[in-house]
A protein has these predicted regions:
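Catalytic loop of the DD-peptidase/beta-lactamase superfamily, centered on the K-T-G motif
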Residues: 3-180
């Protein structure tokens, strides 16, 4: 392993502007699940919280081999929303500089999930969050880690060969006649 310096995220702005920890984000999730209240105190008015959790636009194709019972897939003010086994899931994921996170909550179940990883080359964060939801809902076990890994492996299977081909083609190009 090689330690990398922590870099500033100022240049990517809102894309990765939350620098936080699990303890603080857990408080944020509790606030989301309790209509803007935290520890019995109204921090953000419920109409404001509700507005962020309403659908503002439809997102892509809802049909999925992995989740064939999905009925909607929308986006609100910063939150993706979809149904999963009869409940509305609200989520947002993101990442930068080698970190990827997933925040999910299901108001009907009073369930919030945070997954923080220090990798961005796979979908472990999504697999783990879905595994937790299934266990919480007492759904039959599915090995999402294996499912998502196979999808990742299939998607990246030809990467090394493609890079080698690109390098070979670049190396075969005419060289400049004068020194650079």
């Amino acid at each position: 392993l090689t330690e990398l310096p922590f870099t500033s995220i100022e240049s990517i702005g809102p894309c990765a502007s939350i620098n936080s920890c699990v303890a603080d984000m857990a408080q944020w999730l509790l606030l989301q699940l309790d209509s803007g209240r935290l520890n019995g105190r109204q921090i953000i008015p419920w109409p404001v919280i509700r507005e962020t959790q309403l659908s503002a636009m439809v997102e892509g194709d809802i049909h999925s081999k992995l989740f064939p019972a999905k009925h909607f897939n929308t986006y609100g003010l910063g939150w993706a929303m979809y149904d999963y086994n009869g409940v509305k899931v609200i989520e947002h994921g993101g990442g930068a500089n080698g970190f990827v996170t997933k925040t999910k909550f299901i108001p009907e179940l009073n369930l919030g999930i945070l997954v923080y990883t220090n990798t961005d080359a796979n979908s472990l964060y999504e697999a783990l969050a879905t595994q937790i939801i299934d266990a919480y809902m007492h759904l039959p076990y599915r090995n999402y880690s294996d499912i998502y890994y196979k999808r990742y492996a299939n998607a990246t299977a030809g990467d090394d060969a493609q890079l080698a081909d690109y390098k070979k083609r670049v190396d075969a190009m005419a060289k400049p006649t004068l020194p650079l």
